[in-house]
């Protein structure tokens, strides 16, 4: 069975149990009328959203598409929006069909809704008790939904998008926008209920007052009637009036006496009550003042103890800071001396810095604990003494308060003395506070100075480190320049030695009268080769070709002139003019010195290595660098002359 209910939220869900499907369609609704029903239709913001019918599950618990009636105009067509799976089938009456609910309910009423509603709800109207069809908690008459077309029959299954919708809306259609909101109706009903309750309460109070007044009035009437009505006694009304007046006068006199006595007693009671209240108030004030003084005394003692402990702690911190400052100064001086020794190049000395931490080794926690225990004992003792001294005074004051104003005056004097003592204690506390503030200010200044000096020392150390790095770089550069100059000096010494050797050999040859052989060759040739055996000398003159090769004999020397282009020789240099010095190296493998070695010997090697200054087999190039040898043509004339 399909049951539709209307709530304030807008959403739709479907549940399938066994073979029967139970569909709940919930949407924003408007309530009209009054009364409640167990079954029936629901009137939503879009019209009639559901009617009662039968449904059967087919293929799952719910549908994922959109369902609608298949056929002509129907009672309700719903476009759903909840994502569920499967389809359901149903047996519709008057255009009822199963729809796959998927949220976003949109109810559209067909033109035959009135007749269908009348036909379907006829079985339930008898249970409700009238032609009205209730919606939610309020009633609505089905005449709001007149029909202009006959009933229609829905198909057994809901299609993916539903069938055609019904005809135009009937003339009796009510726009939900014109209906009041449920919140407004509910608020109005609550306010009316509260007003009715208030009026009922006032009316009940008035009724009670009227009843009370009526009862009092009846009593007064009875009394008046008893006094004024004549009695049936034989004496007659005259004697009764005389007796009543006599008794009334007597009673009135007694009443006046009693009233006077009552007034006097009340006055005396009020006077005594006033005195008692004054004494009680003064006693309570004195007790309160005494209690306040005791509390202030204890508080002041605790504050003084705490202040003293704070002062001791601050003094300890100041001593520790002084020692730390001295230690920092010693470390700084040691570092400055180390840096100065490193910069000036003096001997490195090992410094041992010894810091005396004996004062800091004191167990401050134990000392503070002992001091705290000592002062707690003193505070307890002082509190007990003060209580012992004040307790008798309190008792005396309690006794003397009842004695009279003299005791009050004495108590005021004692209070004045206590106030003076409290003022002195307050002044002492203020003085200690000011002293504590000054000490804290000094500590702050000292800490600031320490931080400032530390920053300055750090900056000085960093600048000294930078200067030290610059000096190290300069020393490295000076060492490199010194090595270069030393290599140059060595090369010059070697060249000077070679020239000296050459000059000594020439002088020896001239002094011994050695001969000189001059050979001239014609044609193109790579160079001349000459050898002087023994202690003789040979001179080979070669045109500027690839480069000559000279072999010096034992004890002799070879001289090559105008070597061009760069040549390869045994102990021969590259460019320019080279001298090969034999003897001591054997087989012509002597040192070769180039005259242009100081000018970086173009094409030669570096100082002390490579071709310019190396002995043995080496590759050297002249200024032109591996240039092609020049071909020279000369006359075929050869002459030999011995001096």
UniProtKB/Swiss-Prot annotation:
Region annotation Linker 1: where it falls in the sequence: 228-240
Predominant subcellular localization, coarse grouping: secreted
Region named Disordered: 1-34, 622-643
Keyword Coiled coil set for record: yes
Cellular component aspect of the GO annotation: extracellular region; intermediate filament
Region (Coil 1B): 241-341
Region (Head): 1-191
Keyword Coiled coil in record: yes
Record's compositionally biased regions (Low complexity): 14-31
Residues covered by region (Coil 2A): 363-381
Location(s), subcellular: Secreted, Extracellular space
Residue span of region Coil 1A: 193-227
Biased composition regions of type Polar residues, renumbered to the chain: 1-13
Region (Linker 2): 382-389
Role of this protein: Released extracellularly into seawater and provides physical and biological defense against invasive organism by modulation of the viscoelastic properties of mucus.
Name of the protein in its database record: Thread biopolymer filament subunit alpha
Keyword tags: Coiled coil, Intermediate filament, Secreted
UniProt similarity note: Belongs to the intermediate filament family.
Domain called IF rod: residue spans: 192-510
Region (Tail): 511-643
């Amino acid at each position: 069975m399909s049951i539709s209910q209307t709530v304030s939220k807008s959403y739709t869900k479907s549940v399938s149990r066994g073979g029967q499907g139970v569909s709940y369609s919930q949407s924003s609704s408007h309530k009209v009328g009054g009364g409640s029903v167990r079954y029936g239709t629901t009137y939503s913001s879009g019209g009639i959203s559901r009617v009662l019918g039968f449904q059967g599950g087919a293929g799952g618990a719910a549908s994922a598409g959109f369902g609608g009636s298949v056929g002509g105009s129907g009672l309700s067509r719903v476009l759903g929006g909840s994502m569920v799976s499967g389809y359901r089938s149903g047996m519709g009456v008057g255009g009822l069909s199963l729809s796959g609910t998927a949220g976003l309910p949109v109810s559209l009423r067909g033109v035959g809704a009135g007749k269908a509603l009348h036909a379907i709800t006829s079985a339930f109207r008898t249970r409700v008790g009238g032609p009205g069809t209730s919606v939610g908690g309020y009633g609505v008459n089905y005449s709001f939904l007149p029909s202009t077309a006959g009933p229609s029959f829905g198909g057994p299954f809901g299609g993916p998008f539903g069938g055609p919708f019904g005809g135009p809306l009937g003339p009796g259609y009510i726009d939900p926008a014109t209906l009041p909101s449920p919140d407004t109706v509910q608020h109005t009903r609550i306010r009316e209920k509260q007003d009715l309750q208030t009026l009922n309460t006032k009316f009940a109070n008035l009724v009670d007052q009227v009843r009370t007044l009526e009862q009092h009035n009846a009593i007064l009437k009875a009394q008046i009637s008893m006094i004024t009505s004549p009695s049936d006694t034989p004496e007659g009304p005259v004697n009764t009036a005389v007796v009543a007046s006599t008794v009334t006068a007597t009673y009135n006199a007694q009443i006046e006496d009693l009233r006077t006595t009552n007034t006097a007693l009340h006055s005396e009671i009020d006077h005594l009550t006033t005195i008692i209240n004054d004494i009680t108030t003064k006693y309570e004030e004195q007790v309160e003042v005494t209690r306040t003084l005791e509390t202030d005394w204890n508080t002041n003692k605790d504050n003084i103890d705490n202040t003293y402990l704070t002062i001791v702690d601050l003094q300890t911190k100041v001593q520790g800071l002084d020692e730390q400052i001295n230690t920092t100064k010693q470390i700084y001086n040691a570092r400055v001396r180390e840096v100065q020794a490193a910069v000036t190049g003096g001997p490195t000395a090992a410094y041992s810095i010894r810091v005396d931490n004996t004062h800091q080794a004191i167990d401050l926690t134990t000392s503070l604990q002992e001091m705290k225990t000592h002062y707690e004992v003193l505070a307890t003792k002082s509190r007990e003494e003060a209580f012992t001294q004040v307790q008798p005074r309190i008792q005396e004051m309690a006794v003397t308060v009842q004695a009279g104003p003299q005791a009050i005056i004495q108590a005021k004097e004692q209070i004045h003395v206590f106030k003076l003592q409290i003022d002195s204690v307050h002044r002492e506390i203020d003085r200690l506070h000011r002293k504590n503030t000054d000490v804290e200010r000094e500590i702050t200044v000292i800490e600031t100075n320490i931080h400032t000096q530390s920053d300055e020392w750090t900056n000085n150390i960093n600048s000294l480190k930078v200067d030290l790095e610059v000096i190290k770089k300069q020393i490295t550069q000076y060492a490199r320049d010194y090595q270069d100059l030393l290599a140059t000096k060595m090369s010059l010494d070697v060249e000077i030695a070679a020239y000296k050797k050459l000059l000594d050999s020439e002088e020896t040859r001239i002094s011994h009268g050695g001969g000189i052989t001059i050979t001239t060759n014609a044609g193109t040739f790579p160079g001349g080769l000459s050898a002087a055996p023994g202690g003789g000398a040979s001179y080979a003159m070669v045109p500027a070709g690839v480069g000559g090769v000279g072999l010096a004999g034992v004890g002799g020397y070879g001289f090559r002139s105008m070597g061009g282009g760069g040549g390869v020789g045994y102990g021969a240099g590259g460019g320019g003019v080279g001298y090969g010095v034999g003897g001591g190296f054997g087989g012509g493998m002597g040192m070769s010195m180039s005259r242009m070695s100081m000018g970086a010997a173009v094409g030669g090697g570096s100082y002390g290595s490579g071709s310019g200054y190396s002995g043995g087999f080496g590759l050297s190039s002249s200024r032109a660098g591996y240039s092609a040898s020049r071909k020279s043509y000369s006359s075929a004339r050869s002459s030999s002359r011995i001096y």
